Amino acid sequence: MTGKMKLFSVTSERPLATKIADYLDIPLCEVELQKFSDGEVKINIEESIRGTNAYVVQSMNANVNERLMELLIMVDALKRASVHSINIIMPYYGYARQDRKARSREPITAKLMANLIQRAGANRLITVDLHAAQIQGFFNIPIDHLSAVPLIGDYLIEKYGEEDVVVVAPDHSGVVRARRIADRLNAPIAILNRKPRPHEDEIMSVIGDVKGKVAIVVDDIIDTGVRATTSADILLEKGAVEVIACATHSVMAGDATERLQNSRIKEVITSDSIDLPEEKQFEKLTTISIGRILGRAIEGVQENRSLHPLF
């Protein structure tokens, strides 16, 4: 790709953007963001960026609707500043769980997100561990779908590699993700057979042997923490000696941090795809940074190299 690179952070992911900037050895560009009394947002980019390749870091965390509007306004500002390309770094893709019509008369909001990002003027999206990989098909621009699984897998090997472990998929749709971790640990897998009900989490059975093993539950998102804690309870009842919960994205909504800290889970492992404020940090939480893989992805895009090793 021709053109000099410029890295921006809007509001949501300044710590992660700083780590990416440190890896790339470039400064973060200054962006002035004003919020008016009625909630409107105004953005001003405080340097000339004409002809550059812009990389914008913004996850859809906390107030997802506010974060999305900030991003769209930022993309419009970049386009009107005559940049060469606009590349969105969205570690956590909001609305990804609304990827299909589960009931009649429901929207497919993950597709609407794609439409908005493209129509605003983005040329590329780099994201991490989408809730549903087929969301890539909602876009007509290039999508680089990276994964934190190798980083989490390396941590698990270092800390639990000598243990008798089993990797657990929290439901049938999570088997592929669990298999990737299991292959790195050379471990068997088990599956929690859940009965889907609105606003409920009922586990019917455990498929596989967990007795006497350290059970590592691998998911993509920890939201309220209910799914993780109910998984831990049933696995311990079935004879697991310890339960470790892993997820790329830690939304930590409501009282999730208190629920997880007071649960029977030994450790919660996640990435910094979402910046958790100090009040949502807790003793059992381990955070692994994805700044390096995102930095490598930007280098690859900038230098027209394959990103396959990062998938």
From Swiss-Prot:
Catalytic activity of the protein: D-ribose 5-phosphate + ATP = 5-phospho-alpha-D-ribose 1-diphosphate + AMP + H(+)
GO CC annotation terms, alphabetical: cytoplasm; ribose phosphate diphosphokinase complex
Main location: cytoplasm
Cofactor comment text: Binds 2 Mg(2+) ions per subunit.
Domain of life assignment: Bacteria
Molecular-function GO term, any one: ribose phosphate diphosphokinase activity
Binding-site positions, Mg(2+) 1: 131
Gene Ontology annotations of biological process type: 5-phosphoribose 1-diphosphate biosynthetic process; purine nucleotide biosynthetic process; ribonucleoside monophosphate biosynthetic process
CDD domains, sorted: PRTases_typeI (cd06223)
Pathway given in the UniProt record: Metabolic intermediate biosynthesis; 5-phospho-alpha-D-ribose 1-diphosphate biosynthesis; 5-phospho-alpha-D-ribose 1-diphosphate from D-ribose 5-phosphate (route I): step 1/1
Cofactor list: Mg(2+)
Annotated function: Involved in the biosynthesis of the central metabolite phospho-alpha-D-ribosyl-1-pyrophosphate (PRPP) via the transfer of pyrophosphoryl group from ATP to 1-hydroxyl of ribose-5-phosphate (Rib-5-P).
Record text on subunit structure and interactions: Homohexamer.
HAMAP family: RibP_PPkinase_B
Protein family according to the UniProt entry: Belongs to the ribose-phosphate pyrophosphokinase family. Class I subfamily.
NCBIfam families membership: PRK01259.1, ribP_PPkin
The protein, known as: Putative ribose-phosphate pyrophosphokinase 2
Annotated source species: Listeria innocua serovar 6a (strain ATCC BAA-680 / CLIP 11262)
